[in-house]
Amino acid sequence: MRRRLAIAFSAAAALAAAAPLVSGPSSQVAWTLETVKLARSGNAARGKKLHQDCAQCHGEAGNVDIPDVPDLGGQNSLYIYKQLSDYKAGSRTSSIMNDAVQTLSDHDMADLAAFYSAQKPPRSTGKPALPNDAAVKLATVGDGVRLIPACDACHGDRGAGNPSFYGMSVLKDRKSQDLTVQLMAFRSGERANDVYRVMRDLCKHLTDSEIAALASYYSETPPEKLPAPSSASK
């Protein structure tokens, strides 16, 4: 574990040092103590009422059987709050979400985040994937040569979450296609709301096959054909 973290943080530090000086946080959310307190103050009951306007796409409890719609049940509340805030500010783009969140207040977003994080996480519907050496290495050790830290060092073991990092997403059992689309969007720069460009700088080193393998590894489903990049902003 210590070796994994050492590799992860060494690579992350190198990435930060290599990034242009003007590449500050790409998100409108600054994790001050006040922001964290607000994001964690959400009321799930109020969030459930607000969710009624979201249920057509995201299902009754935040999970829906549509490949490119993300599952929200059991997701980190701070991550959800950040994404909603970024959609509203325009630092994350989506033809649907940018309009959908414009009437939400900061407290509304905290309430929705509390509701979704309190729901049951999605369950994998496919057969478990066979272990993939490339995915396991990237997830647990990383690749120091390419300055790629272990994914699990930030996202938790098997992507189950890491409360030590504010706003860190849960990857475990999320849809393979959605994970693939998001990694591809970070790689191309189409998605640019990662703080200090960390995900973009990591993903630019990943091959198509590595992205597919990581998506399969965390979703615990067999690899699927890579989706078209044009769906990445959903």
Give residue ranges: language-model regions.
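N-terminal export/targeting leaders of redox proteins
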Residues: 1-37, 85, 220-234
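C-terminal capping alpha-helices of c-type cytochrome domains
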Residues: 22, 102-125, 177, 201-233
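Electrostatic cytochrome c docking/interface patches
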Residues: 22-51, 65-66, 118-147, 230, ...
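Short linear capping/connector segments at secondary-structure termini
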Residues: 32, 96-100, 130-134, 167, ...
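Gly/Gly-Pro-rich "capping" loops immediately C-terminal to redox-active cysteine motifs
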Residues: 37, 44-48, 62-89, 98-103, ...
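The canonical Cys-X-X-Cys-His
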Residues: 47, 54-61, 112, 148-157, ...
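Inter-heme linker and motif-flanking segments adjacent to c-type heme-binding CXXCH motifs
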Residues: 63-64, 90, 118-133, 138-145, ...
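Hydrophobic, ordered structural segments
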Residues: 78, 83-124, 136
